[in-house]
Amino acid sequence: MNTKIKLTYKDVPYVLEYDRMSVKTLEASGFSVEEFVKKPMSNIELVFAGAFIKNHRKTKQTVIDEIFSKTKDKEKLVETLALMIEETYSSLFDEPEGDEGNAEWEVVDLSPKTSHK
């Protein structure tokens, strides 16, 4: 989750980014990666608004819509938002650093054992 978008609109600076909670909020609003890939035009405004959740949660939807309508190079914007979401999903599989305090786990086979005579 390294990629961020910095923008200024009407002299107000914004830092758009995602974290796991903002993506969960997006998913609760109906977002899915598969639908975004299939129908980006139907989902881009939701994805753009979702990027405000982490740092600018109280920004009104009307302001977000206005910012989106005034943003140039929307193709690059969509690519960057998709990358940011991908990074957030990938972070689920990040391995913890070091060994101290990490949870240990193993697979236990509980299927019945059969004996052969």
What are these regions (language model features)?
Residues 1-8, 23, 31-38, 58-117:
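Charged interaction scaffolds used for protein-protein
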Residues 10-12:
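Short acidic/polar mixed-charge low-complexity motifs
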Residues 43-54, 79-86:
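Short, hydrophobic/amphipathic alpha-helical patches that form generic packing surfaces
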